[in-house]
Amino acid sequence: MTQVEGLSTWNPAFRPEDNESIITNNLAQLVLDPESRPAEVSPVDVHTSPFGDDADVENETHVLESPLPSEPQDAPAPVATDSDPSQNADPITELKDVLEQPRHIDGNDSSIHPDDTQVAENVAEYVSTQPEDDKEQANGLHLGNTVAEGMSAEHDKDEHTSGLHLGNSVAEASHFSAPEEFSGVETSGNGLHFRAVKGDTSWIDGDEVEEDKDAMPHGEISNDRPGFWGNLGNDGRDNEDDFFDQLKTQTKPIYVPPETESRFEEGVPLLDNSPQTPVEQAQRGDNQLDNVFAGDEDDEGDFFNEIQKSTPEEGPFHITRKSTTQVLSTLDTTPDSPFSETSPTAQDFNQILADTSAQNETKEPSDADLAARWQAELSDDAEETMPPEDDLAARWQAELDDDDDDLLLDEASTANNDQEAAQLNQDHNAGFAASLQSPFGTPENPARPKAQPISYTPHQPSTSDLLQGIPAQAPVPQPHNAPTSNYFTAQAPPNPVTTRAESFAERSKEGYKSPYDLPEDLARPRRPVVSKQVIPQPGNLPPPPPRSSSIPAPSPQPSKAPAGVLGTSPKQPVAAVTPKNFYEELPLPPPRPKSRPASSGRYTPNPTSAPPPAPLSVPQSIPAPANPYASIPLAPKSAGDLQSPPELHQPEKLDPYSSLLAPAALGAPVVPGAQSRYSPKPPGLQAGTKPLPSPRYSPAPPASTVVAGAPPPRNRYASQPSSISGPGAVLPFQPRTSSPLAHHEKISYHPPGVSEERRRSEPAAGLPPPSHAQPFQPPVIPESQGPVDAGIHENVQPSVTQPNSPPRNPYAPSAYVNEFAKRVAPVQNDLPSIGTQNVAYAPPVGESPFVPPRRSQTQSPSQQLLSPRLSLPPIDPLQRPASVHGATSPTKTVNPYAPAQVSLHNRALSQSLDFIPPTDGQQLDPLERWKGAPIVKFGFGGIVTSCFPKHIPRYSAGQAAPMIKSCPGEIKICPLNDRLPPAESIVQYPGPLKNKSKKKDLLAWLSSKIAAFENEGDPSFDPTQPDITKRHEEKILLWKIVRFLVEHDGALEGSAEAQKSLRSVMFPHLQQSTTDQVPGDSFIPAATPQAIDASARSDAADSHSIESLRDSLVLGEREKAVWAAVDNRLWGHAMIIASTMDRSVWKQVVQEFVRREVRSTTSRTESLAAFYEILAGNVEESIDELVPPSARAGLQMISKVDGQGPAKNTLDGLESWRETLGLVLSNRSPDDQRALLALGQLLLSYGRTEAAHICFIVSRAAVFGGIDDPQANIVLLGVDHHRLASSAPLHNDDSILLTEAYEYATSVLAGSPMNTLPYLLAFKLIHAWSLADQGRKSEAQQYCDAIAAALKAATKPSGYHNPHLFYGVDELSARLRQTASDAGSSWITRPSMEKVSGSMWAKFNSFVAGEESDAASTGSGKAEEIGPFAKVSGTPTVSRSPSVSDIYGSYPMGGAQSAPNTGASRYHPVNQYALSSSPEQLRGRSSLDSQRSSSYGFPPPQRRGSQEPSTPVEMNIYQGMPTYGSPSAAGYQSTPPQTSYMPLAPVEEDSAAYSPPDPQPAPSQTLDNVSPYQPAHYAPESFGQPFETNDASATSQFEQGGYMPPSSGGGYEPPFVEVNPASASDDVEDESNEGAKPKKKSFMDEDDDDDMAARAAAIQKAERARRDREADEAFRKAAEADAQKPPPTTAKKGWFTGWFGGKKEENNSGGGPIRAKLGEENSFYYDKELKKWVNKKDPGSSTPARGTPPPPRGSAPPSRTASGTGGPPPPAVGTPPLAALGAGSRPSSSAGVPPRLTSSPAPSALGAPPPIPRSVSTSATLPTPPDGSAGAPPRPATSLSYASSIDDLLGAPQARKGPAARGKKKGRYVDVMAK
């Protein structure tokens, strides 16, 4: 057909001579008025030639007289007789079929028969192609239009097609009784299956029916009507009966139409509107209806006879059109002009029509029966006689009324409706032709078996079936090109966009090769009988695949595939609908208020430009054009998948998912809208019963004429797409696709015409768009795609990009994406058929493996076309809802996100194949690990080892399917970064931060992080963190504050520029001009309460108040005056007076002022009020102004000041924290830091961690400490350590690095000599491990080195420098050394200049210093470092030579951090870094336990014998010590064998740092175990008794059970180079008096060890005498030689010449002693009396030393020099008490409590000064007998050193020298060899 105009101007159903409205009304009345029988109408008077006014009246007469013009002569259609049980028994069903078939044309106008539509279209087309018959054509078109007008008088709104509306209206008429026969002509030429019904036609004609009702008992059309219908109803019921009888009996056309009419009749086969299942109608005894239209032929015999050349046959009346071959053979015109006058086919039709005129008379006997049946079926009384049908009719009428309120409107709108109807008819014809393939839309074709309409025609569900929740979604009409039109999809669009009528030739592109090329339609019987299918539960059957007419009807899986055609079993592709009773075909409408399926356009998208799409289950025999997407494996779940958006009526905004979200309302059958009897409206469209694929989503691809921009009106049913409710029920009533493959092919084809609103409404279904992003695929138009598809693509292109489509899912396997890209039509995204969408979310029950992604962006086509969001790729298969993965689609049974995207076949096999079980017992494994499973191991250094099992199929005889043998797969090792590439930032963190050179890099990194935080936007909403957005902003501010600190070298203030910069950071919104304003101007709004409380203004001039105030002051009652001023709001007076009074009064006055004046304002004055409180000194109470205590207590207080009650949330004051902070920073006051701390605590209590930390930083009074420190305010910036649900936040790299940056700013940049955060070293180690795990081993090694350096450099080790930390650093370093470096894996490291130069200088220095021979002589050089295991850390040497700075030497002492701590806690760390120690660290170890493994589980630190503590002090100096792991004061002590907790005597330095003011004894020890040695700050009186005597000490030692060497304080220490004469004299004295005076009892001399002590003393004495003699002799010789020689010349040389030019003679003296180099002049001489060398320049050296005697000769010196801790001198010598020494050497760490000593004499141990926390030896002070008697130095632990070892005697060369005062102890050993 050419253009819509043709249809609008001529319609074969209309009399050309009659006015459109008149003809339409008459025709409608005739069709609807069973009483107006064509047989009774005078043949000539009534009808004029449809082709012109001058046409033969005879033709018209014959048309009316002919019972029912059948197909061309060669395809005669026998007249249905009453005898035909199927026909007579079911005339209503036939009528309903006729009525509903047009629905396919008009989205909702189901009353239009497809044949009618085709008739209209063919006639219009023919007329347009017959210029000589322009007038006739125009008249004919007028006839069609007027008929449509008459029909759509009620359907004025939506049902505008001629003929279509007749049927539709008939279906809708609740009073429409079942007709006995068809009255009138059943013309398929223009879709005018005008089956005159014996019922009131008021529902169609409205006015006209009323006019004729007077003459007709049942509203028959009056014979008075002019024109075509004038005489049809002259005789009332009799005429109608005659007419029907004629229809039944007439075998030949009553009238032979002229050639022109014959041509139109020839066109009838072309216009097979059979989407309506004319077979079904025919099978149902539709000849009654056919007769109704046969009677019409009497008036329009020429035209209708041409169209219906069927010859009546006995038996059931069937209108069998010519076979395609016959039609083509007789037709010599092109498809565009099928009705050529010269064509033999036209002549045949004319002849047949002429013959049928006589037949009309023969059928009259059955007309009465038909009329009776019509009356019974269609009359209002029918409701009583036929309850189900009656209800259906009533509901049908209600639904129609509801949907089409204007359905019964005036005929004035019928013209427009006719045009639309014609267009829709064309659409339906296209769709129906494909499905029915019958040239006629005639309901019955005798050639077609009646019983087979089930198989041929889509199952016409019973009313109960229809009400079972099947959404009455008429398939979206497809464009003319729709590959396969569907009975159901072809529904007249309610508001069709004026589209030109298209010829069948055009439709051939979509599947029509010619108007007659539908032989499959004749084979309707082939279609399996479809029994009424109760709508399966959604769980039982998946929703039908998307109705894509372009998709060949899938052979639906019986259980899964939804019936392609409504009423068709899923396995029946045939489109024929089983003829049901009238009510079954007319689905009962659900509650009228819900949706009106009968509505012309709401229910089905308006296929304005193209014929409606064919239903999914179009008979496969129909040559449906190949669906371009049919090959796509995507199984469209909803027939609406390929709907023509322009053709679609824009449905009401309904929940697109409602149909699928809720299981199809199985309980209540849904009455399909008149428009789509196969897509019954879901009952009421309840949430749970949303219609599944609705007609408007029918897959009809829009013709190229489809205008994407003009979305059809929303179909409230169509807008309800698939639901996620699971496998949708198979909808036998809903033909959703003509392609049998559509059930199994996943198709995302989306007609662009669907309104955008539908897209918006879909989300309402509760299906949030899938989180996964949809892969982008460029649109690809399949080759099979017909013109319609092309048009669709054209329309779709603008909407190729769909913003609604979520971003591609990066995790979706590429294989899956590619697969969809290959098989998904490009239009999918643009034209998402709602039908498809409807079903899309209900995957078949069997498709459990795939859980369809939440439907995303499956908007209605119109939405996609109109939506501005159409910016995403057209092919977005994952975007499709589950429709992309059709429930019944076997092609996609696996999760699309499964990484291994194997082929479909492989997937199927892998899921079904069995494994070969092992026979070795592994088959009993309940976990079935023998089947294999992927194994992934994350190794050190960022290495990932993976192994995936191999499944090898094994075939065996007798088995069709193989079995799987699981074998280990290949082991792969790859860097973690290859699998999970880290999100690399532009700027790398420059850590570790060692020096100021890193400042620039650090600032760049901080800036990049801040920018990243700002760009990432607000984090997703977390209900557990309602303030997540605020916290995000505060986090950014915290980072900015740290950056500010770095920029300004850790200073927050100090310059105006710095403060200005800080304000700009904290208040970026403030104007720069505010700096020039009065302070606080920026907060003026909060400080201007003038407008409030005008009744009592402050400082009001009240003379009486002033006088009273003056009187009080005169009397000296200032306080009374103050409060009087306050009461009278004389704030100025009150404050002035209060300023002179006690500060408490001032605070109260200000507080009152704030409460009454500041807080009473309505503006946000919390910050100002808090600031005033701070200024007033109410520091702690200032936060109450932000959040009142009542609010913090959870109470809501009502203010009586403003009288408004709780007008706002009391917690809103928290939002003023920033303003408060700004006020404080800009106006510093003495105690404002306390206020800031309080503010921070307040914020922290409410979870505002970042804001709290900002306040802490700014306050400069916050405590940074370990997590175990209860007083620590901050552990890591941004982490609330008080509310840690896990330790994960403590491992956050950002927090660690930010805290490190803060430390860097406040220490390195600020010039602090030490790191301010010693506890942070442990977190740095955590970060180093994290770097190693990421494969950044070089950076991790740098951190290890930095940590080790910090530990070595710490002169005052912190308690956090615990063994855990040392061991962790050592372990990580060792592992890093063992692994290949980042640069390469070579064993030989590449040398660098730094390494080379460093090694050279090191060797040079060692050579100059004479240390180069140490390695060679001792073999302790680097030799062992060679080889692959050189860097493998092994067990440290048992007796390592101690080093003052050695980390291993230092960490055992675990020195507590010294801090001049004024905190309230006695264990408060010095720098407010609370030390921590585990309980294990408090455990002491006896010397016997020194070799036992550490309680920490790693090798214990190598301790020197001098370290071994003596009897542990019986007190817990560190009670309450944090458990972070800091060692006890005694350092790392051996665990006593007997007790689990027995702290030994702490090292002096540690005890000094940590001794609490009032220590308590350890619970496990008795006072007897108290060590005579007391730390500097130890308060002995806490024990309540003086130190024990020697016996007590001995007893305690015995009780301990461990061997403790005797302690003389610091143990044995090698002598200094500077020989102290006093020491020598002491030695002499001791030696001379050795025998006389009793030996000082040492630890070894106590009790049981008397004999041992005696032997040791004897040995020592003998050894000492020997050494003295040797030394004296050697030195004497050397001195004499020196005296004889001049001073060595080398002494006068410079250091360089001294190094290289000096003579080494003195060093060549074999085994002689090495002469000490004492300078240019030897000032030493040997004093024989004193028996030692004396310095002549030191007069005091000649005085005898009164120190303790040397240790027994038997005791070997300690392995390490303990020069830092000389043994304490006996108290008798008057050695200053330890407290004094400790105070001078180290600050007290006690909380403000000065060290105290007991009144008892200080033990000799107190004489030892506090050790320098440098080496373990310094902290290993051993107790001496409390009596002060000098005892032998303690014998070193035998396990750690050898007494006879010269190395032990000499000790480390770097041993530090002790104070000169302590040198006297060592004066005895002046042997230079010691140095």
Swiss-Prot record:
Pfam families, A to Z: Sec16, Sec16_N, TPR_Sec16
Composition-biased stretches (Basic and acidic residues): 93-116, 214-223, 503-512, 1661-1683
Coarse class of the protein's main subcellular location: endoplasmic reticulum
Membrane spanning residue stretches: none
Functional description taken from the UniProt entry: Involved in the initiation of assembly of the COPII coat required for the formation of transport vesicles from the endoplasmic reticulum (ER) and the selection of cargo molecules. Also involved in autophagy.
InterPro entries: Sec16_CCD, Sec16_N, Sec16_Sec23-bd
Comp. bias (Acidic residues): 378-391, 399-409
One Gene Ontology CC term in the entry: ER to Golgi transport vesicle membrane
BP GO terms, sorted: autophagy; Golgi organization; intracellular transport; protein localization to endoplasmic reticulum exit site; protein transport; vesicle-mediated transport
Gene: sec16
Disordered as annotated region, ranges: 34-140, 211-241, 258-814, 835-868, 1413-1443, 1475-1717, 1733-1875
Subcellular locations according to the entry: Endoplasmic reticulum membrane
Biased composition regions of type Pro residues, renumbered to the chain: 539-559, 692-702, 766-781
Family: Belongs to the SEC16 family.
Membrane topology of the entry: Peripheral membrane protein
Compositionally biased intervals (Low complexity): 596-607, 660-674, 853-868, 1484-1495, 1775-1785
Regions of compositional bias (Polar residues) in chain numbering: 273-290, 322-360, 413-428, 454-466, 1434-1443, 1531-1541, 1563-1572, 1587-1599
Keywords: Autophagy, Endoplasmic reticulum, ER-Golgi transport, Membrane, Protein transport, Transport
Lineage per the UniProt record: Eukaryota, Fungi, Dikarya, Ascomycota, Pezizomycotina
Protein's name in the database: COPII coat assembly protein sec16
CDD domains tied to this protein: ACE1-Sec16-like
